[in-house]
């Protein structure tokens, strides 16, 4: 699932009333009244040759958790299914019979959908790979389709 990011991020474009480009936790705090949903990349960042790597998953979780902390310090209550997904996968060995594919897009999209529908604002931090992540694209498309403000930390492409 690919999006036309240049169209979404265009100043004065069709989505400019909903999309804030170059946002940050302070701006999110000024515009958020409710739960923020932090959409961060995962699947493409945590694999090599279609094999899930816990070391990469841990790094992705830390990078996304850093953004949760930055929002927390700005007094924004935020959830990040990427962090919950990563940490659940890190714990798989502690639960008998737990077999979940960390790279199963459809499973994780369905699992995270109930969190997404509670969001009052969608935040996409500038974590490497955000533009190519199918889950981030799904989240942003859903937000735009449902009139939920989108805050992109990345600036306009040069």
Residue ranges of model-derived segments:
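Conserved catalytic or regulatory cores that recognize and/or transform ribose-phosphate-containing ligands
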Residues: 1-158
